[in-house]
């Protein structure tokens, strides 16, 4: 019989001084090699930012994203982490707006992370608990919700709704983002996860609403950054992958990148 999951197995993979609680879980007793990382972000300590890629999401409005973390002194000093966004436009044409610039319009019934003018964040479903509003300054949509108002989606058995690998595998590297009832964000990423297993990990981590982000090991990446003194006196940042089986490289998101992503800065 398969080994029972170790749940959770707390590890010190992330530098504790980053202030983002992190632990690992082995969530699938039938796949003891499946390991997921769970990272908590408190918006009282950190700001989350959205960047459109240089290629994706392929805009219907002619806009092209910068694809990189802004290279200014304040951002470099505050930069803590960055992680992957959602699917390419061809896989659903889910909405994306950055600083009131619409790359793809929002779709009803789709899981959405929205940024508001007062600085708050809300993760929910567009047209239900997130209504179109001039107060929304940015949003990223992706798929139907994994978790809505505390309930894991009953549709999660329909595998194709939440993505398959190129070889039609449903149990693959996946990532997702949740929001707890008190407003904290939870990022989860791991190998050999079904959409249902990902949703369960997010739920156990306290997510009241949650959405799928990108999938497969070519696209899932979480990078932490540390500040070092540059030769010219400017602050430089050095990236480190959270896991070596993530295909990204340590300098991910510091140079123009094709896909959308999120980055995290410490509130100054």
Mark where each language-model region is.
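Zymogen propeptides
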Residues: 1-104
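Conserved, well-ordered active-site substructure
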Residues: 92-109, 162-163, 168-209, 220-268
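Hydrophobic residues embedded in beta-strands of well-ordered beta-sheets
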Residues: 46, 119-122, 184-185
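Broad, structure-driven detector of short, well-ordered beta-strand segments within folded domains
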Residues: 39, 46-47, 112-115, 177
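Catalytic metal-binding/acid-base residues of hydrolase active sites
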Residues: 88, 216-218
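Extracytoplasmic
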Residues: 33-36, 76-78, 108-110, 141, ...
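Active-site-adjacent helix-turn-beta-strand microarchitecture at beta-sheet edges
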Residues: 83-153, 157
């Amino acid at each position: 019989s398969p080994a029972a999951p170790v749940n959770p197995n707390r590890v010190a993979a992330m530098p504790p001084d980053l202030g983002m609680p992190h632990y690992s879980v082995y969530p699938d007793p039938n796949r003891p090699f499946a390991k997921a990382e769970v990272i908590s972000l408190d918006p009282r300590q950190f700001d989350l930012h959205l960047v459109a890629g240089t290629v994706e999401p392929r805009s219907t409005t002619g806009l092209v994203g910068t694809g990189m973390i802004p290279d200014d002194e304040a951002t470099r000093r505050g930069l803590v982490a960055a992680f992957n966004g959602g699917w390419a436009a061809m896989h659903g044409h889910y909405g994306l707006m950055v600083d009131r610039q619409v790359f793809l319009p929002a779709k009803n019934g789709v899981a959405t992370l929205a940024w508001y003018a007062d600085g708050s964040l809300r993760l929910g479903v567009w047209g239900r608990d997130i209504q179109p509003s001039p107060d929304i300054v940015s949003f990223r949509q992706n798929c139907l919700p994994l978790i809505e108002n505390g309930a894991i989606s009953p549709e999660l058995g329909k595998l194709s709704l939440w993505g398959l690998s190129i070889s039609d595998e449903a149990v693959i590297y996946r990532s997702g983002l949740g929001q707890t009832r008190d407003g904290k964000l939870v990022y989860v990423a791991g190998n050999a996860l079904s959409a249902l297993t990902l949703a369960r990990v997010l739920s156990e981590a306290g997510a009241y609403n949650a959405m799928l982000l990108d999938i497969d090991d070519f696209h899932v990446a979480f990078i932490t950054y540390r500040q070092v003194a540059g030769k010219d006196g400017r602050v430089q940042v050095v990236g480190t992958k959270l896991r070596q089986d993530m295909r990204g490289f340590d300098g991910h998101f510091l140079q123009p990148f094709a896909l959308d992503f999120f980055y995290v800065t410490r509130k100054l």
